[in-house]
Design a protein with these regions (language model features):
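N-terminal, charge-rich interaction modules
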Residues: 1-74, 91, 150-152, 156-157, ...
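Signal for well-folded cores of large energy- and translation-related assemblies
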Residues: 53, 112-116, 147
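Short glycine-rich or small-residue beta-strand-to-loop segments that form or flank ligand, phosphate
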Residues: 64-70, 95-97, 123-129
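Gly/Ser/Thr-rich loops at beta-strand to alpha-helix junctions
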Residues: 70-77, 129-137, 160-161
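Long, charge-dense
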Residues: 79-118, 158-161
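Short, non-transmembrane amphipathic alpha-helical segments
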Residues: 82-88, 138-147
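Short, surface-exposed recognition loops or helix-turn segments adjacent to catalytic cores
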Residues: 99, 123-127, 155-163
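Extended, charge-rich low-complexity interaction segments
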Residues: 116-141
């Protein structure tokens, strides 16, 4: 009998996906419309337009921008359109939402852009913990993307994986 240690995980053919690798690698700046409101609550069209015209958008140049309003008030749809028209000349991308929601949206786009054919009939483990927090919606997205492509889909680590899906033969 030999005392050779065999790495069964390395020989198993498992592919580990770390969702953190699909996190967007960009800075997202926020533009809160509250600063353009009268008393932080009311949008006056004339004042709003003048404020936008006088606003220095240089900080948003070539950045991804999240546009939202933190005030608990009603903002007409055209106001977001007007802000987008001003930002379009400066920013690289404009999204509705706060920084976190835009980051999640971009994260989701990266997962949806994943080439699922790379994992055709493979055993895949989606890593359960990593360097950055990953929302539940991203785990749902990767499951939708890979199910029916992979031979098996698991969650966790190779040493303690939870089976999620196994293709019927």
């Amino acid at each position: 009998m030999t005392n050779e240690i065999i790495n069964r995980v390395a020989n198993s053919g498992l592919i580990t996906i770390d969702l953190a690798n699909y996190a967007p690698n960009i800075e997202v700046l926020e533009l809160d419309l509250k600063q353009f409101l009268y008393d932080g609550l009311i949008l006056k069209e004339k004042d709003f337009r003048a404020s936008l015209k006088g606003f220095n958008f240089i900080d948003y140049e070539n950045k991804t921008t999240a546009v939202f309003c933190s005030a608990s008030c009603i903002i007409p749809m055209w106001a977001f359109m007007l802000v987008a028209s001003h930002l379009k000349n400066a920013t690289s991308e404009i999204y509705y939402g706060n920084k976190d929601s835009v980051f999640q949206k971009l994260f989701l786009n990266n997962i949806e852009g994943l080439n699922a054919f790379e994992f055709e009939n493979k055993k895949v483990i989606v890593k359960g913990c990593g360097q950055i927090p990953v929302s539940e919606s991203l785990y749902v997205a990767i499951t939708k993307k890979l199910k029916n492509r992979v031979a098996s889909l698991m969650f966790g680590e190779a040493c303690s994986a939870v089976p999620v899906y196994k293709k019927k033969i």
